[in-house]
């Protein structure tokens, strides 16, 4: 087994503080599952290159706890790892890209501050990855909908999280949902341990997994212990702006936590400040623009079919920024109507930019 025998202990000190993070939001104390006497194999420095000749085994030599923190306080893992120098070389071929890593489990549509907290906890244990499923909507027959974050923009967001994760940006790893849909909770954890060869998982307290979502967080901890990998369960990041009287999302799972559903609702309402608080950044809309999409030298007008992710609701949005490639940002106003997105600048002539290509990807950040 890749990770040596482990003993998983549930951290009994569940801190229920709700400290503000400065944006009207708060963190509940993380419930950390602690490990004693187990070995970690970190993943390769660059999962895509596979050009390393040796994997180092690291040993957890002290437990770690969790506390409620404000945004200025960062919990530190004291004396957690010690490197062993007598490990044999391991073959690179055949290893999964997440081998030896710590995977955060969830649906990472919005890449909001709750998702960021999962990766922060993963980075404190080892190399952080986001493990998610693709093709879920098609398999389950859900109506297709635009993503909150454009696929081409996700790497930028993850890179921005590096400063929270020990200067190491988390990487994404996707699994076809159809390939795991019928797995029992035990089979799913065994896949993580034996096939993907991860050394640990991080999940939220409401995480469900396995066929028909039959497994919960406590079962995840138990199964991970049996498979010799660690599990870290953290409390949900709560949306402190919306009180209990206003939590009307229509979602029975909604207990007031930050979620992709809340982000979608805030976008639909056009509340861009609230969206920024939930995301931990300004919402960025990606447009696919052609030269004929510029009716004037200071305006871009594209149909909704040319946007790559979810726009805010119908309305006029001022104090936005237009970004074209590596060009500096340009102040602009955005008008969203039922069929088009209009972007108008006051000072810069868009026709002066390089439009030699058939189309360009243009970004708009909402203030």
Swiss-Prot record:
EC numbers for this chain: 2.7.7.2
Major localisation: plastid
Known cofactor(s): Mg(2+)
Domain of life: Eukaryota
InterPro entries assigned: FAD_synthase, Rossmann-like_a/b/a_fold
GO terms (BP aspect): FAD biosynthetic process; riboflavin biosynthetic process
Pathway assigned in UniProt: Cofactor biosynthesis; FAD biosynthesis; FAD from FMN: step 1/1
GO molecular function, one term: FMN adenylyltransferase activity
Biological role stated in the UniProt entry: Catalyzes the adenylation of flavin mononucleotide (FMN) to form flavin adenine dinucleotide (FAD) coenzyme.
Protein name: FAD synthetase 2, chloroplastic
Source organism: Arabidopsis thaliana
